[in-house]
């Protein structure tokens, strides 16, 4: 699959880039993408802190007060949730959200996410060489008209000037190739890859 290389303002750049069909030419499957996104979001969740319940608190278990004639309820011990210092009724318990997912399924999900963006209009730029000026980058992206949410993926590391210029632009996010993931790719309107990012991603699956 050949894609025209563009400049950051959306104009035609130099030459074309050949995208591997093994990475960018798959037919996306909703069930695979759903499994990978669910796995990602579950792994982001923190572990809930356990609350001390009635059996966990250290209070006397001796019955206080008489059974009859005291004019009060027939309480058995001070651990009951209605007392100050008593256990929590139906409190939160420790839950592990780190579900496992086969590496091959994760890799397949990422390739399908890239393929879905390739079908929708993947953008490839030569590089991210810009001045570290937010105003200038905003003007370029406005001309390109890539949508409200744009994910830009660079090669080994993100270009410093581009990262500085883009960090205050709402809806523009930047990642190195090693950070490419299904959730971030799917939640953006447009995926922009540099030549270096294409090489890194293809080497990631073919290496």
UniProtKB/Swiss-Prot annotation:
GO terms for cellular component: ribonucleoprotein complex; ribosome. One of its GO terms (molecular function) is rRNA binding. GO terms for biological process: translation. Keywords: Ribonucleoprotein, Ribosomal protein, RNA-binding, rRNA-binding. Pfam families: Ribosomal_L4. Signal peptide: none annotated. Residues 53-85 are annotated as: Disordered. Coiled coil: none annotated. HAMAP family: Ribosomal_uL4_B. Part of the 50S ribosomal subunit. This is Large ribosomal subunit protein uL4. It comes from Novosphingobium aromaticivorans (strain ATCC 700278 / DSM 12444 / CCUG 56034 / CIP 105152 / NBRC 16084 / F199). The gene is rplD.
